[in-house]
């Protein structure tokens, strides 16, 4: 018996899609006349991948003796008709398996109908497992049905969707034809499941906080604005859940976390999407040092659970998450990757402003209204060192003026107990010991309002209710946010954040 490895004759390549669709609609019309266009009474008992796993070592004599009866359904991806016998490769949600279809077993009428079925059709079969002469596990079909007619032709099997934007716009087609895309989103699910599992093991409670905020807060970002008709008030899609999660710490839940969407009305890039997924978690009686240790272990374990290893390959370069993550201050990172800068220069605000002009940074912009040396150092770090942080690196000791929610250092004036984690030159996580002094927090909010009044659209609003919550007393707390999309990019070797978001936003089709 011969096995197929090629699709049906490429008639679709010589015809435009409209003609193909017209022909398929005629076939659908005939099915409607027969009253069997879209049946819904077939229940699969098995999945392809499970069968391949379970019977991977079972030879044909053993399969014949076992008489393994199966019922499977899926999309027909390959088809080869050879007289009285045919082969079809069917793809279900787990993988692919081959059907062996003969006229004698399924009957002349069904076999004749099968010849006119198209690639992309959803089909179902009952039969028994066997191995072909070449050793491929297959289903010897005894009953065959068409469950759903595909009206649009699939892309060429060898090239898939060549247009990258079309992959994003028609993700459903991309998922049909690309096993790599399917594996990416399976890995995403595994990574998130890993995070949830380990958060639960550590005593964290998963919660849900509002997506509509009366005051945007928790991050420096430009919000999306909407209107609540029933309350007749302006609302904002949340830019971060932070202030609500810390209200829960005040309320007595000592360890909380949330995995959900944030929205920031800002630019789109290979690492930025206006709608993205974050995990934020807060633990009472911890600080930023504890957070760094915990975050490191969390990410390492997510890699193992999602990919099977902490040793990754990202865009052609090796990356080993099993090694201890590096820890550097902002100035240490600058001097590591731009050693021409001296300690004295990095402490000189005038020098830093002049240096930043070389990078075309406008230090007279509103966001630099209250910029001290620390802020200028941070911007220089972003220009000289950030993109070079390939190995996992915690950058610590952020200036207070860019960390309005972080606790100040007890030993370093103007510095906060804050870190950001960078891997492959991208920020993956941001965390800090939380500011729980209501008077200090109120003053920092006031300074943020000054920056906003001066034109800084990303400066924070004054949140009086959050101050009121802090006035009841919040225990010492550490909090961290992990970018799920960027983490999945790392774990799946994806160069663009849109590769790991099922339906990223795109411009309207013309």
Curated annotation (Swiss-Prot):
Q: Which domain of life is it from?
A: Bacteria
Q: What does the record give under GO molecular function?
A: ATP binding; lysine-tRNA ligase activity; magnesium ion binding; tRNA binding
Cofactor(s) recorded in Swiss-Prot or TrEMBL: Mg(2+)
Q: Which GO terms describe its cellular component?
A: cytosol
- Please provide the record's keywords in A-Z order: Aminoacyl-tRNA synthetase, ATP-binding, Cytoplasm, Ligase, Magnesium, Metal-binding, Nucleotide-binding, Protein biosynthesis
**Some GO term, biological process aspect, for this entry: which one?**
lysyl-tRNA aminoacylation
**InterPro entries membership:** Aa-tRNA-synt_II, aa-tRNA-synth_II, aa-tRNA-synth_II/BPL/LPL, Lys-tRNA-ligase_II, Lys-tRNA-ligase_II_N, Lys-tRNA-synth_II_C, NA-bd_OB-fold, NA-bd_OB_tRNA
Instruction: Give binding positions for Mg(2+) 1.
Output: 420, 427
**Cofactor note (record):** Binds 3 Mg(2+) ions per subunit.
Task: Indicate which residues the UniProt annotation says bind Mg(2+) 2.
Answer: 427
Write down the EC number: 6.1.1.6
What subcellular locations does the record give? Answer: Cytoplasm
| Record field: catalytic activity | tRNA(Lys) + L-lysine + ATP = L-lysyl-tRNA(Lys) + AMP + diphosphate
What is the top EC class of this enzyme, as a single word?
A: ligase
The record's comment on protein family reads: Belongs to the class-II aminoacyl-tRNA synthetase family.
PANTHER family documented for this protein: LYSINE--TRNA LIGASE, CHLOROPLASTIC_MITOCHONDRIAL, LYSYL-TRNA SYNTHETASE
Q: How does it assemble?
A: Homodimer.
Protein name per UniProt: Lysine--tRNA ligase
Source organism per entry reads Ralstonia nicotianae (strain ATCC BAA-1114 / GMI1000)
- Lineage, highest ranks first: Bacteria, Pseudomonadati, Pseudomonadota, Betaproteobacteria, Burkholderiales
């Amino acid at each position: 018996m011969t096995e197929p490895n090629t699709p049906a004759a490429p008639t679709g390549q010589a015809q435009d899609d409209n003609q193909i669709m017209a022909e398929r609609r005629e076939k659908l019309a005939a099915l409607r006349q027969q009253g069997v266009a879209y049946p819904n009474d077939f229940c699969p008992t098995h999945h392809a991948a499970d069968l391949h796993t379970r019977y991977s070592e079972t030879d044909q004599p053993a399969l014949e003796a076992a008489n393994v009866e199966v019922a499977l359904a899926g999309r027909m991806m390959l088809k080869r008709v050879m007289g009285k016998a045919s082969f079809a490769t069917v793809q279900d949600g787990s993988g692919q398996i081959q059907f062996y279809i003969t006229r004698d077993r399924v009957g002349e009428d069904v076999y004749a109908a099968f010849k006119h079925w198209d690639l992309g059709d959803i089909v179902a079969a009952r039969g028994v497992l066997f191995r072909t002469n070449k050793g491929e596990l297959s289903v010897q079909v005894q009953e065959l049905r068409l469950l759903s007619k595909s009206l649009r032709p699939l892309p060429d099997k060898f090239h898939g969707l060549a247009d990258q934007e079309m992959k994003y716009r028609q993700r459903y087609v991309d998922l049909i034809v690309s096993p790599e895309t399917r594996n990416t989103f399976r890995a995403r699910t595994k990574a998130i499941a890993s995070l949830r599992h380990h958060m639960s093991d550590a005593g964290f409670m998963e919660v849900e906080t509002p997506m509509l905020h009366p005051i945007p807060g928790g991050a420096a970002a430009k919000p999306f604005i909407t209107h609540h008709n029933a309350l007749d008030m302006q609302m904002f899609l949340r830019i971060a859940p932070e202030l609500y999660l810390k209200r829960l710490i005040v309320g007595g839940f000592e360890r909380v976390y949330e995995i959900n969407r944030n929205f920031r009305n800002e630019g789109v890039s290979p690492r930025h999407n206006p709608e993205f997924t974050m995990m934020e978690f807060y633990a009472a009686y911890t600080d930023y040092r504890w957070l760094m240790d915990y975050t490191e272990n969390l990410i390492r374990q997510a890699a193992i659970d999602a990919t099977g290893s902490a040793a990754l390959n990202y865009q052609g370069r090796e990356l080993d998450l099993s090694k201890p993550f590096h820890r550097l201050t902002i100035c240490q990172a600058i001097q590591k990757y731009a050693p021409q800068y001296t300690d004295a220069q990095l402490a000189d605000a005038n020098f830093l402003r002049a240096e930043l002009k070389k990078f075309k940074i406008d230090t007279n912009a509103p966001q630099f209204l209250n910029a001290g040396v620390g802020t200028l150092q941070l911007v220089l770090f972003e220009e000289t060192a950030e993109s070079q942080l390939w190995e996992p690196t915690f950058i610590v000791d952020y200036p207070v003026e860019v960390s309005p929610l972080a606790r100040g250092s007890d030993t370093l004036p103007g510095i906060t107990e804050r870190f950001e984690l960078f891997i492959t030159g991208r920020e993956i996580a941001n965390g800090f010991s939380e500011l729980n002094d209501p008077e200090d927090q109120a003053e920092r909010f006031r300074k943020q309002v000054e920056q906003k009044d001066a034109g800084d659209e990303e400066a924070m609003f004054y949140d009086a209710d959050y101050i009121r919550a802090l006035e009841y007393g919040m225990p010492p707390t550490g909090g961290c946010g992990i970018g799920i999309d960027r983490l999945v990019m790392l774990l799946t070797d994806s160069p663009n954040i849109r590769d790991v978001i099922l339906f990223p936003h795109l411009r309207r089709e013309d």
